[in-house]
Amino acid sequence: NWYFENIDRSIKNKDLKNYISELQYGNENISGSKNYWNESSLKISAIEQVKLLMKIDNQQLKFDENYINAVKDSITLKKANQYRYLGKTGTGIINGKETNGWFIGTIEKNGKSYYFATHLDGKNNASGKKAKDISEKILEEMELMQ
């Protein structure tokens, strides 16, 4: 997260609004705190996250391919002979409790991309790590991580 937070801090607010709009990222509202993406004003659904991953893969965004590849490299969790596994977790914390966990990603295998998003919502222990663990169990059952 520190990597993406540092990039975020280096971008002017006007430019950031333009990027968020270009991505059509959720409700596009970054008016909240400096951590607008973490239990604040910016909201996005699991379906919207998956659609964004698909747009990135299908080069439907006006961003330089080198930047797209840099982001994909930064979220690559595993490269194996048979597949490439990309993903990003997130955990929303309210009053010290993990109330919102998510994990989104892609498996690239045999020339195809498989997109997924897992979202957990609860009073406590709804972390990105738990969402990732659930996702990986499902992906393994589907034999996509072999």
Please state what every model-predicted region is.
Residues R9-K12, M54-Q146:
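Structured C-terminal helix/loop/strand segments within mature extracytoplasmic catalytic/sensor domains
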